[in-house]
Amino acid sequence: ELDIKSEASLDATSNLSSADVDKLLTGAYKSIMEPSSYSYFNIMASEIMADNYKPVKFQWYQVQYLHEHIVPEDDILLSYYYKDFYTAITRANTILRVPSATNAQKGKARYVRALSHLRLYDLFERIPLIDETYVKGPIAPSSGKDVLAFIIEDLKYAKANIEKFNVANASLVQLTPTSEAATALLARVYRMNGDIQSAGKEAEELITSGKFSISDNPKVNTSEVILKFAGNLAEANGTWGWIMSYDAKT
């Protein structure tokens, strides 16, 4: 039997270099962008159900189900919506268990966890809350209020610990969570939770920061972007970017 230390795998229960933790974060971001092989459904489902998108052509009957709010219980895509968002949550929890992870890295992991729980909340409301202390086994779903409270705590930590948005390097820092990204999502979740005063406070903080502004040209909207997870062009065309494009209607 060979006792050779792996040169490729990472043991998240041991101290890791900052660069190695960043690699784990990249995996978490990847699972946000592409929760499953049907990620266009994952990402667009709640938007279609909320009537934020007006479909031009139903290429999949599941999209029509979403738009008409008649998704049957045995729709196979429900399993993708439900379980695959937990991939990002699991990866975030792995990072939170790394002893050497910095507070900023933990903040980014908690942002990922918050966003994934929020996507699940948008679709199902009552969901199991999975944190870094979870061990395998059955877990009951939490109430909608408890889910939002959990998300808020994650985002408050993320806001307090992730680096601030650096306008001088905007095109790069837009690609990963920043303190301002947590602030923006926190405003949304406070609003969903009925806390209008706190939502307004977070939103006003972003507006008055002077770091973001409405662009006159929608094709050049860098000044508007707070956070934009981005992979390569092949991922964009092959997953959910194409279905929202002009070409999709043909």
What are these model-derived regions, one by one?
Residues E1-I43, A203, I214:
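Membrane-proximal, proline-rich intrinsically disordered regions
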Residues D22, Y61-F124, P141, N161-E163:
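Conserved, well-structured interaction surfaces
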Residues L25, I89-A92, L148, L155, ...:
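Inward-facing hydrophobic residues that define packing positions of alpha-helical scaffold repeats
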Residues A45, Y53, W60-Q64, G200-T250:
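Hydrophobic-face positions in mid-chain alpha helices that act as interaction patches
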Residues N103-Q105, V112, V147, S171-Q174, ...:
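Structural signature of alpha-solenoid helical repeat junctions
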